[in-house]
Amino acid sequence: VCKNGYIPKSDTDYCAPNYYGESKVMGEKLVRESDLNCNWSIVRPTSIWGPWFDYSYRTFFKMIDKNRYMHIGKKEFQKPASFVGNTVHMIMKILLDETQMSNKETYYLADYPWYSTKKWAMTIQKTLSAKKIRTAPLWILNLIGFAGDIIKFIMRFDPPLTSSRLKNMQTGGNYPIENTKGICGNLPFKIENAVFKTAHWMYKKDFIKHKPEEIISEK
């Protein structure tokens, strides 16, 4: 219901970037304006990843496995995301809430404490014992992204990096999740365990070549 990076000022502050987003706004408005004879809550998932995921974040893991991923400079980008196991935990907590505090509330589903794209990538690299991830200046990645745009236009092939994908990687935000924390409590999966479970599934499916090893979670 809001474009990537836009932080809403309220539950009804919408900024949909496309027709798909507009359709979700319409769905929320229908729920809010209805006279439902039951309790209801609205959940807004962020970027969900984990076993059985497809395309974008699966490619993220595969690029690190093949040592083709590069950090974007030294800046840390906060990308609200959620491991699917944590997402299910949050939904069930909201769904089975008996306190009434969740009634007519809106919840963002994002892991906490948050992790940057850089930390996420380094956790994947360590779990796979892959080669150390290199850091590239932004101008180099801009050139690669532009080349990807040309390849996509001419060859109808979707390369790993395009200008729009690079922009998306640099866009994040701190979504309001205090009410999510309040009702869901501690999440069951830390990033280290979540990455291992995801990589283990990918290894069994032959999506990656490095056999994952679980690393000890940070305190």
Predicted regions and their residues:
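Catalytic helix-loop patch of NAD(P)-dependent Rossmann-fold dehydrogenases
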Residues: 2-49, 53, 65, 69-73
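Residue-level signal for the nucleotide or nucleotide-sugar donor/cofactor binding architecture
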Residues: 18, 79-85, 115, 175, ...
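Substrate-positioning beta->alpha
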Residues: 26-27, 53-59, 73-96, 104-108
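Conserved catalytic core of Hanks-type protein kinase domains
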Residues: 34, 63, 94, 143
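Glycine-rich Rossmann NAD(P)(H)-binding loop
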Residues: 50, 72-77, 105-114, 125-127, ...
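C-terminal beta-strand-loop-alpha-helix "lid" module of Rossmann-like NAD(P)-dependent dehydrogenases
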Residues: 59-65
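Mid/C-terminal beta-alpha module of Rossmann-like enzyme folds, strongest
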Residues: 97-160, 189-192, 196-219
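Active-site loop of classical SDR/Rossmann-like NAD(P)-dependent oxidoreductases
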Residues: 117, 160-178
